[in-house]
Amino acid sequence: TTIKLNDKMIFSYPKICYIPSERNFVAGVPNFSKYNEGNNVLLYFAYDWSEAKEDIKKLDISNLLSREVSYENINDKDYIFDNGSKLLLTNASSGVQSVLPLYQTIIYMLSNLYKKQRALSPSKEMARKDFANEMIMVANRIADGENISNFKKHSNILISMFKMLESYDVKAINKFSDLPPKELSHNIYEAVHVLDRLFNYHFTQLFIEEPEQNLFPDTQQEFVYWLLEIMQNDKKHAAIITTHSPYILFALNNCMMGGLVRDNIPEEEVSDFASHSAWINPKLVSVFELDNGTLRCVQDEDGIIEDNYLNTAYKKNSEEYLELLNYYEDEE
C-alpha cells in the first residue's frame, strides 16, 4: 500500500462508524453483540455500541427526550431509569431503544475514543514496536558516529519513508549522504514519530441512517443541534446522514442560517436561539436529494436548503388541510 501525502499534511486515519436504522433491533435483543454469524453492518454496529457501553456505564439522555431518562449498566445488564421507574432496556420504549445506541455510540466515537490509546491486535502491535525500535537503533548508531555504509539494508526503506512522509519535519532525500549524520539521525526520529501516528485514529467519519426513527419532531431537532455541537472540535469529524424527515432538514437549516447571520446578531441575543451552539458555516454542509436515481443538490447559492421533496410533501399536506378547513363550521 502506498500512502501519498498532499500539501505536506500528515496522513489522517479515520475511525469509520456506521449507525444503521435497525439500531433499535440491536437494543431489543439481549447480548446481540455476541452473535457472530454473517458479515453485515448490523453486527459491526453491535460491536461498536458494545465498545461504547464498556466505556460509558452511565448516561443521562434526558436532554434529547425532554423527560428524566437515564441509562446504567448494572452487572452486565442494560437498564433504563424512566421518570423513576427501572426497567431493562429490552422492555423500554422504541424511542429509547432507538436513541440510546445512537447517542451513546456517537459520544464514544467523537469523544471518549480519543481519550485512550488505540488497542491494536497483538501481531500489529508487535510489528509496530519492532519496526520503530529497529529504526531508532539505526538513528542512535548514526548519531554516535557509526559509518552510514553499515546500514545499506535499511537505506532503501528509510529513503522511501522520507519521501512518503515528507513534511515540515521530515526531509525527502535520495541517499543517506545527502544529510550530515546528526541531521540524518534526526530525520529518522521524525519519520518514525510521524509513521507511528498512522496507527492511531485522527477523526471519526459517521454514517447515520434515519436518525429520526421512533423520535418525536422535537427530539429530532434536539438531536441535530446536539450532533453539530459535539462535532465542533479540533478533530474535524464528519458525518453523512440519510433521512426521510423534514424536521431533520428544518433543524439543519436553522443551524446553517445561524452560521450565515451570526455576525449580524447582537451578542446578548445569541442565546435566545435554541440552535445557537450548533450554528455552522453552510459551506461545510452539502445537502442532496435522490430523485429517480439521480443526486440533486437542494441548496441555494448561500448554502441554505431550498424546496425539496420532503419540504414539498410537507407543504402539500398543509395546503390540503387549509383547503378542508374552509368547510369546517365551528359549532361554537
PLM regions: where:
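C-terminal lobe/lid and adjacent interdomain/linker elements of RecA-like ASCE P-loop ATPase modules
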Residues: 194, 218-332
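Walker B catalytic acidic pair
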Residues: 209-211
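Walker B motif beta-strand of ABC-family P-loop ATPases
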Residues: 205-207
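Phosphate-coordinating catalytic segments in nucleotide- and nucleic-acid-processing enzymes
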Residues: 1-203, 278, 286, 293-297, ...
